[in-house]
Amino acid sequence: MPVKEKVGVVISNKMQKTVVVKVESRYPHPIYSKTMIKTRKYLAHDEMSECNIGDQVLVQECRPLSKKKRWSVARIISRSSLIT
């Protein structure tokens, strides 16, 4: 079974070895055909705590690491220009 992957933006890194990643998905409205944007937040494991707010990351599904954490940061796609 292939591993699920999602691309998102880090919105919080205040926890130890954990980041909050915002993932946007676009889909057409079934009646009006307008493109809708659905946003979902995932807790992802960041072993080295190297992600910063605004970084674009690739997250992969993994085994449950805690009550809400089932994703891990696979790689950082692009770094943010924000200095934190």
From Swiss-Prot:
GO function terms (MF aspect): rRNA binding; structural constituent of ribosome
Coiled coil: none
CDD domains: Ribosomal_uS17
Subcellular location: Plastid, Chloroplast
Main location: plastid
Pfam families referenced in this protein's UniProt entry, alphabetically: Ribosomal_S17
Entry-linked NCBIfam families: PRK05610.1, uS17_bact
Name the UniProt record assigns to this protein: Small ribosomal subunit protein uS17c
Organism: Thalassiosira pseudonana
Lineage: Eukaryota, Sar, Stramenopiles, Ochrophyta, Bacillariophyta
